[in-house]
Amino acid sequence: MGVPRTEMNTESSRVAPPRGFRDVLPTEARELGLIEQTLADSFAASGFTPLHPPLLEHATADPEKRRQIQFLDSDGSLVALRPDLTTSVARLVAGRYRDMTGVLRLSYVAPVFREEPALSGGSREILQAGVELIGGDGALADAEILALFVECLESCGLAVCESTVQVGNIRLLTGLFASLREDVRGEVLGALHRGDIAGGLRRASEAGMPAEQLRRADRALTGVAGDVDVSDVAEICRGVDLARERWPGSAAWGVPNLALLPALPYYTGIVFEAVHPDAGVIASGGRYDLLIGAFGEPRPAIGFAIDVLQLHRALFAESWQPRSQRPLLLLRPSGDERATMRCAAALREAGIAVALGDVAERAGRPVIHADVIDDRRVMLADGRVAEAAALAREVGS
């Protein structure tokens, strides 16, 4: 007799994760771990120190509230899974570092959580790796962060070409529509964020934006920069050129895109994102000089966040090969359990990874089979007898 469909559906829902979340199995987890470690090493090499904001934040009434996953805690307080690490860092800095002057260099590798419509199929958990330079101002700070942005992607193995990184300027973009009412300007910018330049300009025209201003905005947004504020365009180009000085002679990268408008609303100056033809947007960042002031004393700041899963997809689209692991020795116990334990300890002390018995999920890791002879020697599958130190040299070669 078959299992009723309703019972099958209930059973399936019990073993599947909630909508928008997924299980990461060992092979992928290892690959993601390699990417995370590479990024963390790049952050540290530029003086950034890791920190860990809490998983929960106070639910807010900001424009991104609709994307927060909220619930009431046992105290009756409305809290949310953190939707954005930059905002969490801004709150932390305003509170914990309010009396500290000077520049802070902070980094993180952690997930954020954002609500997605049920029918969209979007992920509600996003693993991010990023940095925040708090207190750094001016062209040099912008260039350093933009250069680190590119360096992080390249250090993971991504081929960064001219079109991979796009650079814009929020001050220029909002200035193009400064004559509009704030609510209308928000509608126009919303259309631009969706990539609908024609729709944004049409809404500006309907709102009475003068024809000359419309022509100027059209030229700026469609790549004809000769009729826009030269100082703003020069700021974008100067930042890109200065960032490229980190690797003199390297291939050119960085395309000015005056229509670039990130999803998050707090950016105030230079903005940038990395786009891959197969994975879409894999990283973004920019200057946000007003965000920390929403929690306390204002401080200039700039940073970026990399979507680690999207970067992973982009790397595999380019036939990325993660570095090989050292093999795992599967040690078959002898009748003497004490000798087995001592042998395993000697092998580990020599630098060999050892598991007693078998391992069902190996995540692509190479294995060596061996039988225990005594507390320091094993017999390999080919019949050779090896002592722990000698085997360690062989495995490590």
Model-derived regions, located:
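Positively charged, Gly/Ser-enriched RNA/tRNA-binding surfaces
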Residues: 28, 34-45, 57-58, 88-98, ...
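TRNA-binding/sensing appendages of the translation machinery
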Residues: 2-87, 143
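Acidic carboxylate-rich catalytic motifs and surrounding loops in phosphoryl-/glycosyl-chemistry enzymes
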Residues: 53-55, 164-169, 358
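Short, conserved secondary-structure transition motifs
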Residues: 167-180
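Acidic, His- and aromatic-enriched active-site or binding-groove loops in soluble protein domains
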Residues: 69-76, 180-203, 278
